[in-house]
Amino acid sequence: MSILAIDTVGTGSSIAIVDYDGNCFVERNSASNNHVESFFQILNTLFDKHNYNYDKIDHLAVVVGPGSFTGIRVGISAAQGINLATNKPLYGVNALEVQAYTISLLCTNSKKNIRAIIKNAQGFYTQLFDFNLLPLSGPTAAREPGSKCHAISSDCITHMDCNLNASHAGLLVHYRLKNKQKLNEVEALYLNEPQYMKSL
């Protein structure tokens, strides 16, 4: 089983391959908001470096948001195009569940719930998961970090400084497939309106 994972929801882009044993190969582009121009260059570099091609990929995964409006659309469009050309199964994961997965790796013996929190310009995004990474709430956006409805309590764990990339999304899909957990179809997750829509 090998997974091609795509993450373009931040200012940079990353594409990763996760193999059957959980080994990760990742390529990044740190140039700000350069998703469209760099996507297939990153993908070709990844394939060339690690002797991969579409025939060696079994599953596709894309981070569907929340994050950059343009980045979300670029990642989803690219993933759907690859899915159409290769007929490989395609799954959507959100950045909060990817963060929850990385937190779970830091606290492997904990049975506490996991509160994923991602900061943004307006406040933060958040979602609650149990220790098996099953969602206990939907993803939400909050404008005030001190909001009581999203307070962090002692019965859950969190970590706000996870440095996420596409390999974490691929590893999450690897985990869910291995544990026979539900994987979602691709649907864009916009928790904030894009700036140009606010002026309409």
Model-derived regions, located:
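Hydrophobic packing within well-folded, soluble alpha/beta domains
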Residues: I15, F39, I57-L60, I82
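Residues at secondary-structure transition points
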Residues: S30-S38, F69, R73, S77, ...
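Oxyanion-binding and handling regions
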Residues: M1-C24, N34-V36, Y91-L200
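DPxDG-like acidic metal-binding loop motif
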Residues: H59-A95
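Phosphate/pyrophosphate-binding loops at sites that engage ATP/ADP/AMP, CoA/4′-phosphopantetheine
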Residues: L43-H59
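Phosphate-handling active-site elements
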Residues: H50-D55, L84-V93, N109-K111
